[in-house]
């Protein structure tokens, strides 16, 4: 039997790669991992974690405003962008250390540098050439710039976390979750925000009613959301940026952020040397066990463009390690995965949208409610929450749940368990609610639309 330097070589130390390395090592495999940037990947370094820290920071302004309705009187407040970024940096450095220690404690050998596949079972990194029985690619994805003049003047979500100054006026291009989240962050921090989206509504792929409701709430929060419009060009003028629109209008801002999509990080990995198949967007094609078209090479996470969420990458990495090194054939599961958008207000979904359910089932029942949350009763804020259940009328099973409102992300996690367990509408009806809460609406919905 041929001998290799490692049983597994992982390229990329993000959430999926680190989980795969640790689990494989726990099964007794000799494992190495290579990372050219920082441990933790997109989620820890320039994604989910720092974004949510900024989201928390941005909510205090609204809290100060709402406090007056509850009898509080406070002096004028101000915000320090530099203090926020410094605190964020310290926390991210701490988490990066946690990730690296997890790898070290699992006795995984670490290579600092860019790894490339040099041929079957062969990887080069930092001048070294090593052999591995199995190679796992977990290199994630990167933001892409729109193909317009002046794109070099734009920033992306990667750049936002390191801005030396928070821009007073910012235009955000896009209608996906990243665009909506950063629009809420900058708006909450007191910046003037214009969100530009060429589509008819934000959050393509989500339930249509949720999309429309969130769009209305974003506008009411103070975001200048413009739909059906795109950017033609960006120019620097008198120390600011001039943004030319397809409507013929122009606006002046201090920063333009592109949040128009992400592409898999497959360039320069040497995939052509081993005939790893890619799709039209450059994502690595894999089967349900994360196997590529090349024997002995696997891929997990955003680089496969299956479902680009951190818990999904972790699940895929864990399933891969158990399958290849743990003797358990575990296909990856992508059904009923909950989604959360940390916009302001938050939006969250699990299961099928109403349109998807009607395409799949002949008998679909819809239950929903839009209402003013209790907090707004005294604050006077003009806002409405939305809850919605999608039910397969043939067997009463709840196949989709959607929510817009405070703590939607926390609420949908519990609802996801119920849907995963194939709960019926009768099960929801028989469950007592916690009163007074937004979440209780899911178990008190009675009127079918």
Curated annotation (Swiss-Prot):
The keyword Isomerase is annotated on this UniProt entry = no
For this UniProt record, the keywords arranged alphabetically read as follows: Cytoplasm, Disulfide bond, FAD, Flavoprotein, NADP, Oxidoreductase, Redox-active center
| Gene Ontology MF term list | flavin adenine dinucleotide binding; glutathione-disulfide reductase (NADPH) activity; NADP binding
Q: Name one GO biological process term.
A: glutathione metabolic process
Please name the InterPro entries in this protein's record: FAD/NAD-bd_sf, FAD/NAD-binding_dom, FAD/NAD-linked_Rdtase_dimer_sf, GSHR, GSHR/TRXR-like, Pyr_nuc-diS_OxRdtase, Pyr_nucl-diS_OxRdtase_dimer, Pyr_OxRdtase_I_AS
**For NADP(+), which residues are the binding ones?**
175, 178, 181, 198, 204, 261, 340
Q: Report residues binding FAD.
A: 15-16, 35, 42-43, 51, 115, 302, 310, 435
Pathway it belongs to?
Xenobiotic degradation; (2,4,5-trichlorophenoxy)acetate degradation
Q: Where in the cell is it found?
A: Cytoplasm
What Gene3D superfamilies does the record tag this protein with? 3.30.390.30, FAD/NAD(P)-binding domain
Where is glutathione annotated to bind? 15, 99
Q: Other remarks? A: The active site is a redox-active disulfide bond.
Function text: Catalyzes the reduction of glutathione disulfide (GSSG) to reduced glutathione (GSH). Constitutes the major mechanism to maintain a high GSH:GSSG ratio in the cytosol.
Q: What is this protein called?
A: Glutathione reductase
């Amino acid at each position: 039997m041929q001998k290799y330097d490692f049983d597994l070589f992982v390229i990329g130390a993000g959430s999926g790669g680190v989980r795969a390395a640790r689990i494989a090592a726990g099964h007794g495999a000799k494992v190495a991992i290579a990372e050219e940037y920082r441990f933790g990947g997109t989620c820890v370094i320039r994604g989910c974690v720092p974004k949510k820290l900024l989201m928390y920071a941005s909510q205090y302004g609204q809290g100060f405003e709402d406090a007056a309705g509850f009898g509080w009187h406070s002096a004028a407040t101000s915000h320090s962008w530099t203090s926020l970024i410094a605190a964020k940096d310290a926390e991210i450095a701490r988490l990066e250390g946690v990730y690296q220690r997890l790898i070290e404690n699992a006795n995984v050998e670490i290579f600092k540098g860019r790894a490339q596949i040099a041929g079957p079972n062969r990887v080069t990194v930092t001048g070294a050439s090593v052999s591995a029985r199995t190679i796992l690619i977990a290199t994630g994805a990167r933001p892409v710039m729109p193909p317009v003049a002046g794109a070099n003047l734009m920033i992306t979500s990667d750049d936002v976390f390191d801005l030396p100054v928070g821009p007073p006026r910012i235009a955000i291009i896009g209608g996906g979750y990243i665009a909506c989240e950063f629009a809420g962050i900058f708006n909450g921090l007191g910046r003037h925000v214009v969100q530009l989206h060429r589509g008819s509504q934000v959050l393509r792929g989500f339930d249509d009613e949720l999309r429309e409701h969130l769009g209305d709430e974003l506008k009411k929060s103070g975001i200048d959301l413009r739909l059906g419009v795109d950017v033609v060009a960006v120019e620097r003028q008198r120390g600011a940026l001039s943004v030319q629109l397809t409507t013929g209008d122009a606006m002046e801002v201090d920063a333009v952020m592109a949040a128009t999509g992400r592409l898999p990080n497959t360039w320069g990995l040497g995939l052509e040397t081993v005939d790893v198949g890619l799709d039209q967007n450059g994502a690595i094609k894999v089967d349900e066990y994360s196997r590529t078209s090349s024997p002995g090479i696997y891929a997990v996470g955003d680089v496969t463009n299956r479902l680009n969420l951190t818990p999904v990458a972790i699940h895929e990495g864990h399933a891969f390690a158990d399958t290849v090194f743990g003797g358990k054939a575990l296909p990856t599961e992508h059904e009923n995965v909950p989604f959360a958008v940390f916009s302001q207000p938050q939006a969250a979904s699990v299961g099928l949208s109403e349109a998807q359910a009607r395409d799949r089932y002949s008998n679909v029942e819809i239950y929903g409610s839009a209402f003013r949350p209790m907090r707004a009763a005294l604050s006077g804020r003009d806002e409405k929450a939305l809850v919605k259940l999608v039910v397969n009328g043939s067997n009463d099973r709840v196949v989709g749940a959607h929510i817009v409102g405070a703590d939607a992300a926390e609420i949908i996690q519990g609802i996801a368990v119920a849907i995963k367990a194939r709960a019926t509408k009768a099960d929801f009806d028989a469950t007592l609610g916690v009163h007074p809460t937004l979440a209780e609406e899911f178990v008190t919905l009675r009127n079918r639309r």
